[in-house]
Amino acid sequence: SVTFNAIVVTLVEHGVTPSALAARLTYAGAPEALQAAVAAGLCGLGTVFVGSTEGAAKMLYEAIPFGEKPTRPLADMAKDIVADHRARKLIVPGLGHPLHKPIDPRTPRLFQIAAENGLSSHYVALMQAVQEEAERVSGKSLPINATGAIGAIAAEFGFPWKIIRGFGVMARAIGLVGHILEEIDDPMAIEIWQRVEKEAGGPRQD
């Protein structure tokens, strides 16, 4: 579908992240095994990179199980969600971005595509309510980031939260192949290794 394609395209590339570096460094050591380099990069996808999609979806499903309708105003549910995360000293998944403030420009476009294709109901609305409550309580700019938007839209699809990270794995595999192609044409892995060896490795012992 158009919406699913938009999700995948959004997740393909995220710059020179730890997973991209892992892929590049592995390829530098084993250029005959492209698949190993991609696999090394994919192992770095977790709760910090890509994994907040599943965290956001899980949070929304816990508030409104799939197939059910909200039993309370979404604003009240959002207050409970934010209060629970603050009490447990947890970050609300899907909110905040180090660069994109006050809005992650990918989010409104994803929500627009979802709405145009009939995939914008109470999960998207609850995610937006959670953002408003989190900003109100913290006094900080906490935009819904792309992975938060994707988590909400994936919940609208009805995908089980446990497999939603898989969409990021699938998409990022494409991006890592692109990084390896770039590594072939314009290498950086060996330079990174040598700089780390020089700057953090200490005196060499022969």
Regions found by a protein language model. Name each.
Residues 1-206:
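Non-transmembrane, aqueous-exposed alpha-helical and coiled segments at domain scale
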